[in-house]
Design a protein with these regions (language model features):
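Conserved ABC ATPase signature
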Residues: 134-138
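H-loop/switch region of ABC-family ATPase nucleotide-binding domains
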Residues: 194-195
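Conserved ABC ATPase "signature" region
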Residues: 112-130
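Helix-to-loop junction immediately C-terminal to a conserved catalytic motif
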Residues: 51
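The feature captures the beta-strand-to-loop junction immediately N-terminal to the Walker
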Residues: 36-38
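Catalytic Walker B motif of ABC-type/P-loop ATPase nucleotide-binding domains
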Residues: 159-162
């Protein structure tokens, strides 16, 4: 049974441009799915509709069988985490630890549990030795792993990655693959927008 569904979804920007028209998709838990296509094909708009950053003009998005219209954007984001293409659009704290821990701190979780979760996630993302560093002491490509960690640590059911391999070297791309496999092993849905066909061939069985 699909956990995340788009049913006949359409979206038009205020300037009149129709970015998504009558799109239907289904995603089951434990799936790893690549979304490919030309620039301007509506890929990022589509995943923003999944995450609640945008709302459909027609059709509906269902998460766990419930329409996202019943939830605020913040409530949707707890279940559908979205890692932006540009990490600098999501980094606001003055240390990598604080950036990863931010959502947990807002949840009221105790410090010991936060420390444990942050360290586990930082290790997964190759950041365990730089937690006290300022995020901008790391390269642009490494900052992508900070934003991935900040989403993964919140344990959403769906993780959306927008062009995660852009600007990454081979080792970093391999780490991305390991992170995605770790997530799907936990029965999470991983949806990745990418133009990296080598990455698609290596990591994905399902491509949209």
């Amino acid at each position: 049974m699909a956990y995340l569904e788009l049913k006949n979804v359409s979206f038009q920007y205020p300037n009149g441009y129709t970015a998504v028209e009558n799109v239907s998709m289904e995603f089951e838990k434990g799936e790893k799915v690549a979304i490919i296509g030309q620039n301007g094909a509506g890929k990022t708009t589509t995943v923003k509709l999944m995450n609640g950053l945008l709302r459909p003009a027609k059709g509906e998005v269902l998460v766990g069988g419930t329409s996202t219209e019943k939830y605020t954007t913040a409530q949707i984001a707890k279940n559908v985490g979205y890692v932006f293409q540009n990490p600098d659009d999501q980094i606001f704290q003055d240390s990598i630890y604080k950036e990863i821990a931010f959502g947990l701190l807002k949840s009221g979780m105790g410090k010991a549990e936060i420390d444990k979760k942050v360290k586990e996630t930082a290790t997964l993302c190759g950041l365990e030795n730089v937690l006290e560093e300022h995020p901008y002491n790391l390269s642009y490509s490494k900052r992508k792993f900070i934003t991935i960690a900040a989403i993964v640590v919140m344990d959403p059911d769906v993780v959306i990655l927008d062009e995660p391999t852009a600007g990454q070297d081979r080792d970093s791309t391999e780490r991305l693959g390991k992170i995605m496999n770790w997530l799907t092993a936990k029965n999470k849905i991983v949806i990745t927008i990418t133009h990296d066909m080598e990455f698609v061939v290596k990591e994905f069985e399902r491509v949209i």
